[in-house]
Amino acid sequence: RQMCIRDRLAYSAKTRGQLRKKLQSEGFETELIEPLLDKFEAAKLIDDAEYAQTFVAQKSRTKKLSRTALRRELAERGVRGEEAENALAQRTDEQEREDAAELVRKKLRPGMDLSDRAEKDKVTRRLLGMLARRGYSSSVSMSVIREELAAYGAEDELW
């Protein structure tokens, strides 16, 4: 059984919490799970701190998730406390604002007529929803959306 678990670890990194759940679901006796996980940790087959660092870097880059969303996803994977907070510390407020602005810019298509108040409100609601799903606070979201809509309007006036 240990070989099968090692093969799984080689396939993709897992947290201690994920492995614990998997072993429980496969019928391992509870008193065997913790010593087995301790062995894997001692052999550096699992490392929650390293997993958290890699996870935060990857999800920040690919999905542009906020620290709040990243913290929630790490907790779902069994990484909490100091390990999670150390990994999240690599994200600054400025990076988070820039990521939110980039997401908003991607959604603002050329040729959108935002002079109509109803259309502008609809676009703002959709942008707020998109940022909220990625864990951005409403204050950061509104601030970024206002800035990007103003910049978008200024670009339209140039043409």
Task: Give the positions of each predicted feature.
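An alpha-helical, amphipathic repeat domain used for nucleic-acid recognition
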Residues: 1-159
